[in-house]
Amino acid sequence: MPQVTMRQMLEAGVHFGHQTRYWNPKLAPYIFGARGKIHIINLEKTVPLFNDAMNFLSSIAQKRGTVLFLGTKRSARESIKEEAERCNMPFMTQRWLGGTLTNFRTVKQSVARLKELEAAETDGTFEKLVKHEVLGLRREREKLDASLGGIKEMNRLPDAIFVIDIGHEDIAIKEAKKLGIPVIAVVDTNYDPALVDYAIPGNDDAIRAVQLYARAAADAVLEGKAAAPNSASVREEEFSAEAGDEGKGRRAPAKKATEKKADAPAAAPEAPAAE
């Protein structure tokens, strides 16, 4: 798991919240205090929640799942795109199109159109058309690429969504919640952490803070991918095990124990999600 220290968070300005008059009382447990009418986030509580979120992202990637990186606000676009591309995950950095998740079949049709236009531009089809037709098709391609280019290789719904600003991406979060897709998100002092599955209390505006979140998320995904079992080696092990069983022949069934085993102690309950 990527290690992000409290000092790194301080240097990136993760602890700076919004003005006190805009606060959401449900984030009160994660607020240290106020300075100059600005809420200060308690990083001692942010760090463990941040680590939990990164562990979850890593586990998704380890199972060969897909994480959609989402950041359409100006301060997040560059970092989200760069880090999503680094870990080879889909992303959206322009305006969220309503129904991207809940009407995914229609979105896939638009993506297919984008791929068709890209192929036509490279295979010489455009050269056979008149100039004004080519200009119209290129404008269509550019428009589709701006809105859907980051998800054109996403062939199914994502297994999780990583979000920078839950207020800015409220429509996407509602769609994910409706479909049961887990949401990992940075939550500033003016929002309710209960709206997402894995809340990271922190500054969602500062560019350096956004870079820190996106970089850590990409690192978590890459670590998860590296830890994923090799499908070829797994099949080879299964084949070897089956061959070994055939060579040994059937074993006699084990005799039942005369004494009952003591019940195993119940597993400790997981800590409840932060609200």
Swiss-Prot record:
Region annotation Disordered: where it falls in the sequence: 226-275
HAMAP family, per the entry: Ribosomal_uS2_B
A molecular function GO annotation: structural constituent of ribosome
Cellular component terms (Gene Ontology): cytosolic small ribosomal subunit
Gene Ontology biological process terms in this record: translation
Domain of life: Bacteria
Regions of compositional bias (Low complexity) in chain numbering: 264-275
Originating gene: rpsB
Pfam families according to UniProt: Ribosomal_S2
Family: Belongs to the universal ribosomal protein uS2 family.
Keyword Ribonucleoprotein annotated: yes
UniProt keyword annotations, A-Z: Ribonucleoprotein, Ribosomal protein
Gene3D superfamilies, per the entry: Glucose-6-phosphate isomerase like protein, domain 1 (3.40.50.10490), Helix hairpin bin (1.10.287.610)
InterPro entries: Ribosomal_uS2, Ribosomal_uS2_bac/mit/plastid, Ribosomal_uS2_CS, Ribosomal_uS2_flav_dom_sf
Name of this chain's protein: Small ribosomal subunit protein uS2
